[in-house]
């Protein structure tokens, strides 16, 4: 049972890393900045990353593979669409990511 969970988590980590790489490419922001930096464009990229991941993972799983708290993941997911209303670049980044994710 534990081995199955480890395999499942490894698969989720692969998805996380692929999507993070794509977010980094499209946003032209280094992956490490997306993960930790609090500049507005980095936060936008992080929100887009979480929005895409939340289509395939729950908040706990995203938290486990990213190292972010569940509260951060939940806040980003819940506030994503509101933030898109005021951040044109975030909306465009998300559209590009959705074509990649399908």
Where are these regions (language model features)?
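General nucleic-acid-binding
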Residues: 1-22, 97, 101
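Short, Lys/Arg-enriched N-terminal segment that forms or immediately precedes the first helix
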Residues: 25-39
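Short, amphipathic alpha-helical "recognition" segments used to contact nucleic acids or chromatin
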Residues: 42-57
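DNA major-groove recognition helix of helix-turn-helix
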Residues: 54, 77-78, 84
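Short alpha-helical "recognition helix" segments of helix-turn-helix
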Residues: 61-65
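Short Lys/Arg-enriched helix C-cap and helix-to-coil transition segments
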Residues: 83-102
């Amino acid at each position: 049972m534990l081995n199955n969970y480890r395999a499942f988590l490894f698969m989720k980590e692969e998805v996380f890393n692929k999507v993070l790489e794509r977010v980094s490419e499209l946003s032209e922001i280094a992956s490490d900045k997306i993960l930790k930096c609090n500049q507005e464009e980095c936060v936008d990229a992080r929100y887009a990353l979480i929005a895409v991941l939340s289509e395939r993972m729950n908040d706990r799983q995203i938290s486990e593979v990213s190292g972010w708290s569940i509260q951060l993941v939940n806040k980003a997911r819940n506030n994503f669409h509101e933030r898109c209303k005021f951040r044109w670049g975030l909306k465009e980044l998300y559209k590009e990511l959705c074509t990649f994710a399908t």
